[in-house]
Amino acid sequence: MKKFLLCFFVIGTSLTSCSKFNESLNDDFTNANEALVSDFNTPFPVINITVNQNEFDNMYLNYTEGIELEAFLNLYRNNELLISDELVEIEIKGTESATYNLKSLGVKFDDTFKNENNIVVSPSNLLPHHSIEKIKAFRLRNSGNDFKKTLLKDISYTQLAINAGLDVDLTYYEPAIVFINNSFSGIMNLRTEGNTNGISRLNDVKKGAITLAKINDPGEVEKKDGDFDRIDNFLNAIEEENLSYLKQDIDINNFIDYIIFHTYISNVDWPYNNVRFYAIEDEPFRFIIYDLDWANTRKIDKHPLAFINNPTKYSAKDAIKNPITDLFTILYQDSEFKNLFNSRYQYLVNSNAFSSEKFNAILDHNYNNIKQYMPIHLDKYNDIGSMIEWFRNIELLKENFKKREESINDLSPLF
């Protein structure tokens, strides 16, 4: 057992809840190498994956090789075993984040799993056009670029989009405590997938009905599944600035909400990267929100139109050409689309759908979910440092969101 000896000072006025935070750090906690599954009596999932240890170690060592392993999944909630020895396939996921000591895992069921009573994933809210009754695969995510900061960023920003009731497609999250062969692995984010399997289950259609493409850094299109000719026709229409074709080929309301959310949260790792768009049969293309780890890190003073026209993590001169920026530019020249976009954006700002108060409430909820167990995680991984550094990083998330909100409000009316 370990105890924290706290000695810290306040930077500026940001650590306004130090006494409250201090109270949660006074108890003993279990060493990571002593932790047992039964130590975690949580309403969110506690997962134990049983796999050949030598094969797992080899997969970890050779994480770029796409190695897939057969394994067995046990899932607990409130110390109750709800999934027992379910056959799954696991593999390492991620690019840069796959270099971390705790790596993201893709978990795929042998057969589509009936998510009765939301056993696998149980989000607090579900958008009305989505279903999570069937799950083929999910991801145990290390929080990507936020792994060394809070573990809470992607899950919190995604929840903000859900709570705002946007007409978007996205992935659903819960925190999860993960064990490998009864050995504590870490606190992760359990996330539904945004690939063809995930999108087909989300829309309750067969996988074969989905046409899906990705845009990866630096703006390269990767056709994944379905009707590749249709994807080519869509991209050609963007190149040819075929407005009438494009207005018919995409879901306009979805695209508007998709652009609004990304530009409001200043997601600089988009849209030359982290883009997925899909269609069901002959229906219009829709766009998927995911991987928000870079939100509100840079360019938080930019007008939304300036932001979308200069997509890059770096300076404006390095802006990366991509189909999404080109598509928006074409559509925004159309008065009907322009009026719809401008009025929708201003409505969401005026209605406080993305207010800092709402974001902070989400972040505080997610913080409270895992704070009791973070000392064990930090005992195994020193990337964040200490509990007080973790708390400071959470406060910085709030501060940066507030700065973006103030920047948008200073620009209002936006159009």
What are these language model-derived features?
Residues 1-4, 19:
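Positively charged n-region of N-terminal signal peptides that target proteins for export
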Residues 35-40, 128-131:
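Short boundary motifs at domain starts and secondary-structure transition points
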Residues 5-6, 26, 401:
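Intrinsically disordered, low-complexity segments enriched in glycine/proline and serine/threonine
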Residues 4-12:
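Sec-dependent N-terminal signal peptides
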Residues 15-37:
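Bacterial Sec-dependent N-terminal signal peptides
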Residues 65-221:
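Conserved ATP-binding subdomain of kinase catalytic cores across diverse folds
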Residues 11-17, 57:
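N-terminal processing/targeting junctions
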Residues 42-50, 54-66, 71-73, 78-96, ...:
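Middle-to-C-terminal accessory/interaction subdomains
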